[in-house]
Amino acid sequence: MFIDLNVVWPTLGVKDLNLVKTVKTLERLGYTAIALNYQYDGKLQNVIKNPIVKELYPEQKIKIYSRITLTIESMPQNKVLSNVTKEFDILAIRPIGDRLLQQTCSDLEFDILSIDFTQRLPFYLKHTFMGLAVSRDIGIEISYSSGLRDVSNRRNLITNATSLVRATRGRGIIVTSETRTPLECRAGFDVINLATFWDLKQDQARKSVGESCRSVLLHAETRRDTYRSILNGCH
């Protein structure tokens, strides 16, 4: 049972022919659940609508979740987080800068910490911050597909992923594809083998595409239930 929590939701939505092909490919490769990821890097607004369609073809067996990834340069207001909690199953945060990374790991309620590991990072992956995220049951994501496209990207991905494994001692890591096309999809066992190159132990690599992803889904469900309970208590 493999899970991929980052399949990019295309700009064209369901009109993009690669979308259904990609999902069908992942299903054929043995994935039982995926998250379609709406990448939002614009100005944060109180209302962000969910464009994701979960039922893509009649014979679909794979379970689909909706995910939003917010790229933030300052701490978001509670209204923004409340809105995306209502709209999306999974909330991922991509903070820009060392200070914001620290605040994100310690203060925000979310499910996945997303970092672009194909670039040279402007901060160190300190055990203090990463360990804090892990202790709060936040999944820390390594996405592999962009590292397949370019030599420089691949080199940075290996360096940064290895640093993350060292900072977290291999705990709390999820490996995702961030794929846009069927050609970028990899079978679960291939992803496990890839993850061992970043110094993840074999059992940790297996968890990164299975158990750790299920933990993220449980965390997301609990976060949404808590939000609904608070909302109902206010009425």
UniProtKB/Swiss-Prot annotation:
One of its GO terms (biological process) is endonucleolytic cleavage in ITS1 to separate SSU-rRNA from 5.8S rRNA and LSU-rRNA from tricistronic rRNA transcript (SSU-rRNA, 5.8S rRNA, LSU-rRNA). Transmembrane segments: none annotated. The keyword Disulfide bond does not apply. The keyword Nucleus applies. InterPro entries: Pol/histidinol_Pase-like, RNase_P_p30. Its EC number is 3.1.26.5. It is found in: Nucleus. GO terms for molecular function: ribonuclease P activity; RNA binding. GO terms for cellular component: nucleolar ribonuclease P complex; ribonuclease MRP complex. Keywords: Hydrolase, Nucleus, tRNA processing. Pfam families: RNase_P_p30. It catalyses: Endonucleolytic cleavage of RNA, removing 5'-extranucleotides from tRNA precursor. Belongs to the eukaryotic/archaeal RNase P protein component 3 family. Part of ribonuclease P, a protein complex that generates mature tRNA molecules by cleaving their 5'-ends. PANTHER family: RIBONUCLEASE P PROTEIN SUBUNIT P30, RIBONUCLEASE P SUBUNIT P30. This is Probable ribonuclease P protein subunit 3.
